[in-house]
Amino acid sequence: MDLELFDDDQLLDDKHHDLIKKLVAFCGKQLKLPENTEMSITLVGDDEIERINREYRETDRVTDVISFAIEEGEDDLPLLPGMAKNIGDLFIDPLTVRRHAEEYGHSFERELGYTVVHGFLHLNGYDHIKPEDEAVMIPLQKKILAAYGLTR
């Protein structure tokens, strides 16, 4: 996985940046994605995630993660051999992640991992709106977290 990680406001330390990078690489292997698959994660604060949520999701509140998948359509040009596929962008609010960790009674690292995996799966076409989709996504999410060693 080719991950671009942006943390302009230094919301996380190097240890947590490393966790994100390793977990994204692990997720890519779990889903058997080509090694040159690209994505980005931008770490933002409460005000910015609320603005993005309001502007693009029409929901005026903070959240932990917002995903913008780059979905293939009929009009897309096919990728040339060896050309990287960009699956999209995640915006993660570590402040909300920390609040969730405290609320749910587990470590910040586990909640950060959960948030990264959850967003990663959304970028790869998984969803949980319909019960039948949730029945696929949530067990896969739990399986990846357990295999990585981030359990409740």
From Swiss-Prot:
Pfam families: YbeY (PF02130). Its EC number is 3.1.-.-. One of its GO terms (cellular component) is cytoplasm. It is found in: Cytoplasm. Keywords: Cytoplasm, Endonuclease, Hydrolase, Metal-binding, Nuclease, Ribosome biogenesis, rRNA processing, Zinc. PROSITE patterns: UPF0054. Zn(2+) binds at residues 118, 122, 128. It is an enzyme of class 3 (hydrolase). Binds 1 zinc ion. Its cofactor is Zn(2+). The keyword Calcium does not apply. InterPro entries: MetalPrtase_cat_dom_sf_prd, YbeY, YbeY_CS. Belongs to the endoribonuclease YbeY family. HAMAP family: Endoribonucl_YbeY. Single strand-specific metallo-endoribonuclease involved in late-stage 70S ribosome quality control and in maturation of the 3' terminus of the 16S rRNA. This is Endoribonuclease YbeY.
